[in-house]
Regions:
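Short, structured helix-loop boundary elements
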Residues: 3, 56-59, 81-84
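Intrinsic low-complexity, intrinsically disordered segments enriched in polar/basic residues
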Residues: 1-2, 58, 69, 104
């Protein structure tokens, strides 16, 4: 995946997280499904770069926070806002210049 494609995926993930802020249960599930699809693309791209394990751990962190927002992890008793902050933090980590060989 080219740098601009990765940037577009990361921007899309940010929009989905932001859209989940006021989303109802059904929309949160749709957003989660879209996040999972985009994260699958990122995982494929991560295989091309060093630090694959670290990148996939951050991708999993994002997926887990969005699953909690969608209500799939009822045992996670953090407020929804904290999961959204965690998801944004994971995206911020992925946008760092050290990920995916992006320029700083």
């Amino acid at each position: 995946m080219m740098e601009r494609d990765i940037r577009a995926v990361l921007d899309g993930l940010g929009l989905l997280v932001e859209d989940s802020k006021d989303a109802g249960k059904l929309q949160a599930m749709r957003n989660y499904a879209a996040v999972m699809a985009l994260c699958a693309d990122l995982r494929k791209s991560a295989e091309e770069y060093r630090g694959t394990r670290n990148i996939t751990m951050v991708i999993s962190e994002l997926e887990n926070h969005m699953a909690a927002v969608a209500g799939l992890f009822p045992t996670w008793d953090l407020p929804k806002d904290q999961h959204l902050v965690g998801a944004h933090a994971a995206i911020s980590k992925l946008t760092m210049g050290t990920c995916f060989g992006q320029p700083t």
